[in-house]
């Protein structure tokens, strides 16, 4: 074989080997890709199949993405199921109250579209707190705001915003209502909404955005409820409702509600003579309410609600310093643990108090006859002793000369204890301020603290000369 033939032969063999290697590499690549997708088919559901997490109530979807070489694997982590609240933690020990929130609704109304409201309150779900109020179907800068001093019209609706967000035009109208209560059971919101004719009103029970139950007026005389948060323990929510004479004998019932359905109704029992507008708080394993006696007493009624057997016990806050308005001066007032004190009991205002061992924390107007100013304090042995008048840790929330209004309690669960908070309604306009034709409010909110705190006053602050008439 001559040199040229040898070179051609070697070249041909090399080309053949290279070609074989090339096809082998292609075969290896095809095999690798095929095996990869075969494995994906075995480990993944068909495209039209949905993988469901159990249980079906999901609060948050969390997608964890893990990068492995050049492969992306998405793994859905099923969240913990939502659970009913049980409020079994102890009450937080506090030294007083610290500022928490103020919405400045009336001041903002001078330059924007803010709802006309009254009867505000605050309630919290597991993550956030919300402010509620009964709207009048109009903004303040609107001629429809004239004569909104009226309590009950078909245009009133329950408004709901995150706490600190004034009720602007984008605010959600939860339901039709001129009296209401709301609470979160750990899974969803319950709203109790009353509207209709004075002598034949309807209470609608809305749970998780759906109407579940309803009840009609049972005494045909302005069915009404708390105007503050209800309380849910282990899936059972309680709400206090009254129908009947506003300054005489009325018919009060406590409704037990599960996921919006009325499961039991108990009549008021015990020594409370007249009960309206209760401010309720969890006192595990039951619920405790401090209410308004609009008939006989300037001392406030107490209702203890047993969730398990539906029994009801009622009496009055013992403290010799009483919490309603109007009332006698502190030097001349008296109280009774079982009965109304029969001191300026006719009329009143929604308020709150809560027990702290044998002591009692309470809030009230500073003025003894009208809704002016607001103060809080602790009465030593005020939960157990009707002669107790030792006041400590007093704070001024609103100065004596500035208007206040309704007030109520709400509870916030922390990591180790349950804190008590309160709000104060700051009413402006008619009847007292006749330079305008409307009636509305803003709110200020404080929460219990174990720390230190200073002094101040937090009135509504709007200059009515700058407002729409």
Task: Give, region by region, the residue ranges found by the protein language model.
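A short beta-strand motif characteristic of beta-propeller blades
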Residues: 165-167, 213-216, 264-267, 314, ...
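Single-pass membrane-anchoring alpha-helices
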Residues: 4-39
């Amino acid at each position: 074989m001559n040199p040229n033939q040898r070179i051609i032969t070697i070249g041909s063999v090399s080309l053949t080997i290279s070609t074989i290697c090339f096809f082998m590499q292609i075969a290896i690549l095809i095999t690798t890709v095929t095996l990869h997708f075969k494995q994906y088919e075995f480990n993944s559901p068909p495209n039209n199949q949905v993988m469901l997490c159990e249980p079906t109530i999901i609060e948050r979807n969390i997608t964890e993405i893990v990068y492995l070489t050049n492969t992306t694997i998405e793994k859905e982590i099923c969240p913990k199921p939502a659970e009913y609240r049980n409020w079994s933690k102890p009450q937080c020990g506090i030294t007083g109250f610290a500022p928490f929130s103020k919405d400045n609704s009336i001041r903002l109304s001078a330059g924007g579209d803010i709802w006309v409201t009254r009867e505000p309150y605050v309630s919290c779900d597991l993550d956030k707190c919300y402010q509620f109020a009964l709207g009048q179907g109009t903004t303040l800068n609107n001629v429809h705001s004239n004569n909104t001093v009226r309590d009950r019209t078909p245009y009133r609706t329950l408004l709901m915003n995150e706490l600190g967000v004034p009720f602007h035009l984008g605010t959600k109208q939860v339901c039709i209502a001129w009296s209401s209560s709301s609470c979160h059971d750990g899974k969803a919101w319950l709203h109790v909404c009353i509207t209709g004719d004075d002598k034949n009103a309807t209470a609608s029970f809305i749970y998780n955005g759906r109407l579940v139950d309803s009840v009609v007026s049972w005494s045909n005389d302005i069915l009404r409820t708390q105007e503050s948060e209800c309380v849910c323990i282990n899936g059972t929510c309680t709400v206090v409702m009254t129908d009947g004479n506003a300054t005489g004998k009325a018919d009060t019932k406590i409704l037990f509600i599960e996921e919006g359905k009325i499961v039991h109704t108990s009549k008021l029992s015990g020594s409370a003579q007249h009960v309206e507008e209760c401010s309720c708080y969890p006192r595990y394993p039951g619920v405790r309410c401090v209410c308004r006696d609009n008939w006989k007493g300037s001392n406030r009624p107490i209702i203890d609600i047993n969730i398990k057997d539906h029994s009801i016990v009622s009496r009055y806050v013992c403290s010799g310093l009483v919490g309603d308005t109007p009332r006698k001066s502190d030097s001349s007032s008296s109280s009774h643990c079982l009965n109304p004190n029969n001191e300026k009991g006719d009329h009143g205002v929604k308020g709150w108090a809560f027990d702290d061992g044998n002591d009692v924390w309470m809030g009230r107007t500073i003025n003894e006859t009208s809704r002016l100013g607001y103060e809080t304090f602790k009465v030593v042995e005020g939960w157990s002793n009707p002669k107790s008048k030792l006041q400590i840790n007093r704070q001024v929330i609103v100065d004596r000369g500035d208007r206040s209004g309704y007030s109520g309690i709400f509870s916030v669960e922390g990591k180790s204890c349950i804190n008590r908070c309160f709000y104060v309604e700051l009413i402006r306009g008619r009847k007292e301020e006749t330079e305008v034709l409307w009636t509305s409010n803003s709110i200020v909110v404080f929460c219990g603290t174990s720390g230190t705190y200073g002094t101040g006053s937090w009135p509504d602050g709007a200059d009515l000369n700058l407002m729409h008439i």
